[in-house]
């Protein structure tokens, strides 16, 4: 085995991970090392489903010889991570599932049509990003479709809360130049429900990427098929940056968040919440709630508030608060 070397996890699979050694050419597939994870790093498996994810900085060793195989010996401290609860079912129901680590920005991709715009998913991810300290942005895709929702009111709502927004079409190329400029030189992730066009956007930004794209409607119901089988960081040589493409997710959990914390993920509530009659106001039906008054006056977007109310019902009450 070689001495410990630093590297970046660029692909996560069921049993092995591809690591790019520091200093190697990201465009050179021959530079990648296929690594297992040392058993001692799995000691937290009862609490965490995946000990290693794409974006992780690691120390690894490599076997002597041409096979380019090795082992991850250490996972370096993460600056951030996006997590969700393990999807329901099986023994891992309540375990944490980290999706990607060390992001510079998480882009939430939603479609303006086919499938229809999903504001609840969009607002869920934005709240999760704020809770976990990750910069986020919004990509409104499929603007070229004749039945597309008007993007300008949406752009106004999200830009008003300091969230960058790109209105794009992977088919016509509309808006891609501005998006490419924001991707340069950093690590980003695309997250979105199945069928919104994440893989198509990546292929339009960097032609030649080996992505399998399924047409919306292949399985009926206006939803695309899950086309990405492994979480992977893609190097975009024209951009000189990394973009993560993760398998389509039908649910993104607000991992570790309690009800009283949700309003922190809706930044437009903050200035109004200071005027609520009760300090522990959850902004539902409490008397003297300044947030609901602001919604009625049109000072807070009604759809954003509807997302907040729906998400609030999903979250647990802090045990300490429940005992008071």
How would you describe each model-predicted region?
Residues 1-23:
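Accessory interdomain/linker segments of ATP-dependent helicases and helicase-like nucleic-acid enzymes
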Residues 119-167, 308-309, 314:
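Charged, amphipathic alpha-helical linker segments immediately N-terminal to NTP-binding catalytic cores
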Residues 26-38:
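A short macromolecule-binding patch
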Residues 3, 15, 31, 40, ...:
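Helix-rich effector regions associated with P-loop NTPase G domains
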Residues 145-196:
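Canonical P-loop GTPase G-domain recognition
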Residues 199-211:
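A conserved segment at the C-terminal end of the G1
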Residues 108-111, 139-141:
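Conserved beta-strand segments of the P-loop GTPase G domain that flank and frequently precede/overlap
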